[in-house]
């Protein structure tokens, strides 16, 4: 399934990758989806958590690490179905139901995706989190108008490109041919595999989080960023049918084998928080042991920015 396509001024909220995500808003009354008009979208980055310390015995301040809690996206809007109060109530109910979806709200760690094709933007962008308060005012419902304010708590302070980027790295056996008698011991057999490296390109203005997928057969697979100390690997073997997904995104931070078994305790190398892909180019190298040449490592990411829209 794929997310619904948005036109100018439209938004959607729902499960990641779901074609049934709720679409609302538009750049005009004629194009407003769901009978909803959004008049304003405001972003509050939240209060920065600081680790500053006073200089002992003198004026001044020693700065520590500043962290951000995740932005709050506040939308002000209204249902707009003139002369149709019952329809207005239905439109608000549909939006509020999607905003406070219990399949997300009551599931530990689950997130929604808020997508925006902001008026004036050439692209659709997204943020991950949960719909929180949505507050209607019913005084003008008889006119088919229900003003509301809705808040969305993001997992971080980032808008991500809607289009997913990916890079596939493969392995190539380092030996070829066969053994032909007569043979004289000791036999010299290849014990390694040549692996591919290529470039991850993050065209956004911020670092972004990769999702790393290893597919067997391979033993001790590892993904490393060349000319850096950063790498992540698995201390085990994957069969040809095995798929290991390492999701470094802050709202996930999981390592799942075949979608059901957590193997986070079997990872080695750098912590997931160190795996961010920096803006511009990062050379990635896939390593491990595979004598078939069939294993792969797929790195997927979304370019990251601070703006709800833009040209790319």
Q: What are these regions, as identified by a protein language model?
A:
Residues 67-69, 106-108, 142-146, 202-206, ...:
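Solvent-exposed loop and beta-edge segments used for protein-protein assembly and interaction
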Residues 57-89, 143-157, 282:
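Oligomerization/assembly interface segments of phage tail-like spikes and tubes
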Residues 37-74, 132-138:
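Short, solvent-exposed beta-alpha or beta-beta edge segments that form flexible loop/patches at the rim
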Residues 1-54:
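Polar/acidic, low-complexity leader/linker segments enriched in S/T/G and N/D
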Residues 162-312:
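Intrinsically disordered, low-complexity segments enriched in serine, threonine, and glycine
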Residues 69-127:
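Long, hydrophobic/aromatic-enriched structural stretches that serve as scaffold segments
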Residues 13-15, 115-123, 224-227, 288-290:
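Short acidic, glycine-rich loop/turn motifs
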Residues 108-161:
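Short beta-strand and beta-hairpin "edge-sheet" elements
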